[in-house]
């Protein structure tokens, strides 16, 4: 469990450095994150944790701390960096990071958990993430948005 989560959450580490293009940073790392949580291995672990939580109450907390909380922290750090740079105007980076990460997956994670259908194609994942990132940036940009 720890090894799997380390390998997936490690993909978020470059995000903390902060590139010049926020939209591309968030899209690139968000697509990698979504691909990771939708992998067969991740879905199997998540299903197992949910199934065994009653017998092993600490398992859910451990999974949450090693997975989602680390992802939220990585995104929050990035948002704080962009906020300090004046690129983003957000009141609560921690809350915003959680909301942004959850919006990236939309219904895809729930569908994958429950419907057991084919995984989305990589280009579909990127399109899904790019849309969520654009919506996020319209609300969080410190610059006036250009007319579209």
Can you say where each PLM-predicted feature lies in the sequence?
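Short alpha-helical
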Residues: 7, 44, 54, 58, ...
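Membrane-interface starts of transmembrane alpha-helices
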Residues: 89, 93-97
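Helix-loop "lid/cap" segments that line or gate small-molecule binding pockets
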Residues: 16, 31-38, 46-54, 135-139
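C-terminal peripheral helix-coil segments that are non-catalytic and often amphipathic
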Residues: 28, 32, 69, 73, ...
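Short, surface-exposed loop/turn segments at secondary-structure junctions
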Residues: 61-62, 90, 116-119
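Alpha-helical structural segments
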Residues: 1-36, 40, 62-77, 127, ...
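Amphipathic alpha-helical segments used for helix-helix packing
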Residues: 37-65, 109-114
């Amino acid at each position: 469990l720890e090894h799997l989560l380390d390998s997936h959450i490690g993909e978020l580490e470059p995000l903390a450095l902060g590139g010049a293009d926020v939209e591309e940073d968030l899209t690139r790392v968000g697509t990698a994150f979504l691909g990771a949580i939708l992998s067969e291995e991740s879905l199997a672990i998540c299903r197992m944790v949910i199934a065994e939580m009653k017998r092993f109450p600490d398992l859910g907390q451990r999974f949450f701390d090693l997975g989602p909380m680390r992802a939220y922290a990585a995104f929050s750090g990035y948002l704080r960096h962009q906020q300090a740079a004046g690129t983003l105007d957000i009141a609560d980076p921690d809350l915003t990071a959680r909301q942004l990460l959850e919006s990236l997956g939309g219904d895809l994670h729930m569908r994958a958990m429950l419907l057991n259908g084919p995984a989305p194609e990589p280009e579909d994942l990127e399109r899904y993430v790019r849309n969520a990132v654009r919506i996020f940036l319209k609300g969080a940009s410190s610059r006036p948005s250009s007319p579209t």
